[in-house]
Structures are given as C-alpha cells and as structure tokens.
Amino acid sequence: VAPDAAKVESLLEQAKSLADSLSFAFDTPSGVPNPTLFLNPEPRQSDETQNGIAGMGTLVLEWTRLSDLTGDDKYAQLVQKAESYLINPTGSPEAFPGLVGEGVSLETGEFLDSRGGWGGGTDSFYEYLIKMYLYDSVAFEEYKERWVLAADSTIEHLASHPNSRGDITFLLQFDGSELHPTSGHCKLLLCSMRHISS
C-alpha cells in the first residue's frame, strides 16, 4: 500500500472518518473518553461513569499520529487531554510511585481507586508511555519519566520470587499497599518494555 499514494490517501481518509465518528466519546465533563459508544440509530454515549487506564492510554499514539499525518491537531488534543489525567494523577493516591489505579472518572478525571498492576486492563497504559517517547522523544519526555517511575516501582515493590526458584520473577497485583500474588501473560510486557527503554 505504501508505494501507492492514492491507496495511502484513501486509508488516511478512512482513518479520519473513523476518528471523527468516534470523537464524541471525549464529550464528557473532563474530556476522559466514554469507553462505550453507540452509533445506531444515532450516535450516543453509554451510561458509563468511568474509563480504564488501558482503554484511555492506548488511544494516544494512534490519534497523535493521525494528527501528524493530517496536519489537524484536533485528534492529538483530544487524546492528550485525556492522557494528562494519567500522567498527572489526582483522586485516589498512587499505591507506589508511578503505579496508578485502574478507573478514572468521566466527570472529574480523578482516579477512583488505587488498584492495579501489569494485568489486562492496565498494562497497555504503561506500554504506550514508552512508545510515545520512542515516537517523539522531545515532545513526550514526560511520558518516559512516568514510565521509568512505574518500572522502578514495579521492580522494587511488585517483583516476587518463589522460595524454590529465585531465578523466576513474578509481578504482583496491588490494591493500595496490599499486594496480591496473581500473575498472567501480560506481565511479560514489562520485561520487553524495560529492554526497549534501556
């Protein structure tokens, strides 16, 4: 597709059309996007009162890139306003430096809990912090700082080793300062992302 300018332009037009169709998700009091939208019979938001950090955090790269490709800053402005609540959290305190909760209020942009970790529903937020820095290291230096803070806290507070296998590391979940010994495939992301950021 890339060598064919007409096809690239057609894909870009479709991406703009899709983003324009979904952009009303950000029409909330805080600018945090509503995670559930209905397009038929007419566009409307769900009754959701919060969004999760992964749902919010994964939009930032694609919508910022769309603004860069189209020269229309409106897409980047929408997602970066929402992302600002994740970068500079308020509400429920961080359980550990850089490690935020899961739910963010659509009304205020404040965190509603201090529960999280590197599982489904949370890990993508952290993943996109370092991806944004790699995308533009000048504009998104703060994202890298946030990533390093979260990674360092993860190593210090969430890393766990079985008594019988000190060479194996598991990452714990947290609810405030209380740690929970659960693990899953998403935890592998930290290892790969830590390698990328070093």
Give, region by region, the residue ranges found by the protein language model.
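Glycan-recognition and catalytic cores of secretory/periplasmic carbohydrate-active enzymes
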Residues: V1-S198
